[in-house]
């Protein structure tokens, strides 16, 4: 099997791609809000509760999702979370009440809270300590890219069909991203296309190796 050069950068690009979808999905409501409020009769006060439901669930979900990722494993846990927020995004289209939307936003926020912990976990797993700042910056590009791509895509979906269609499309992207992540992501120990040279480069820069080297140097002195 042919080895892939700079395999670690493929992995961080993958998590960046998932982060793009993550932020695209969460931004969709803000773009569609005027149309939703006009067609459903949802008031500004009710809309504020919808927004708050997401923020509360997202805030509470971050440490929980971090624990979930550490416990279950990065590959499976992040795929599950992406699938859940994809289904929750699509669920927006099935409800026209503020309480229904608030529930979907809360479910979406809780599962979307996995994105940053997953990105940090990928960077710490795949990169030596000296490159993690750059790796984290690369995957975090997805936050801005997702927020940037959402307005034209969501607006087009609304004009082409309806606000419900916009959430079906954006949610479908998350489901595809979940599958893509599950089948493409590999931990270094399972990555058959990772060269021995790059594997050594990554592992030699990990904390456990750096500590060992430091102890050896200290004992020699």
Enumerate the predicted regions with their spans.
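Helix-loop-helix hairpin linking two adjacent transmembrane segments in secondary transporters
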Residues: 143-188
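Extracytoplasmic
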Residues: 10-44
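Cytoplasmic helix-loop-helix junction between adjacent transmembrane helices
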Residues: 104-143
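Helix-breaking motifs and short loop linkers at transmembrane-helix boundaries and internal kinks
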Residues: 41, 73, 94-100, 111, ...
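Conserved MFS/SLC helix-loop-helix module at the cytosolic interface between two early adjacent transmembrane helices
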Residues: 60-99
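Juxtamembrane intracellular "pre-TM" segments in multi-pass secondary transporters
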Residues: 1-4, 187-221
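Residue-level signature of mid-helix packing/kink "hotspots" within the transmembrane helices
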Residues: 27, 55-63, 147-148
């Amino acid at each position: 099997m042919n080895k892939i050069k700079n395999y670690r950068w493929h992995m961080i690009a993958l998590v960046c791609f998932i982060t793009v979808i993550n932020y695209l999905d969460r931004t969709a409501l803000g773009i569609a809000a005027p149309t939703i409020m006009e067609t459903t009769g949802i008031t500004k006060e009710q809309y504020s509760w919808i927004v708050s439901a997401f923020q509360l669930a997202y805030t509470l979900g971050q440490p929980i999702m971090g624990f979930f990722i550490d416990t279950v494993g990065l590959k499976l846990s992040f795929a599950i979370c992406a699938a859940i927020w994809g289904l929750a995004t699509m669920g927006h289209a099935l409800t026209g009440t503020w309480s229904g939307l608030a529930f979907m936003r809360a479910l979406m926020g809780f599962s979307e809270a996995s994105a940053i912990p997953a990105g940090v976990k990928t960077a710490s797993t795949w990169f030596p300590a000296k490159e993690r700042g750059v790796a984290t910056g690369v995957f975090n590009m997805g936050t801005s890219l997702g927020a940037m791509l959402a307005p034209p895509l969501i607006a087009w979906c609304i004009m082409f069909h309806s606000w419900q269609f916009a959430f079906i499309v954006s949610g479908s992207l998350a489901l595809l991203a979940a599958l893509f992540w599950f089948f493409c992501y590999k931990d270094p120990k399972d990555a058959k296309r990772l060269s021995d040279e790059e594997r050594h480069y990554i592992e030699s820069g990990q904390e456990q190796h750096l500590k060992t080297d430091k102890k050896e140097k200290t004992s020699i002195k």
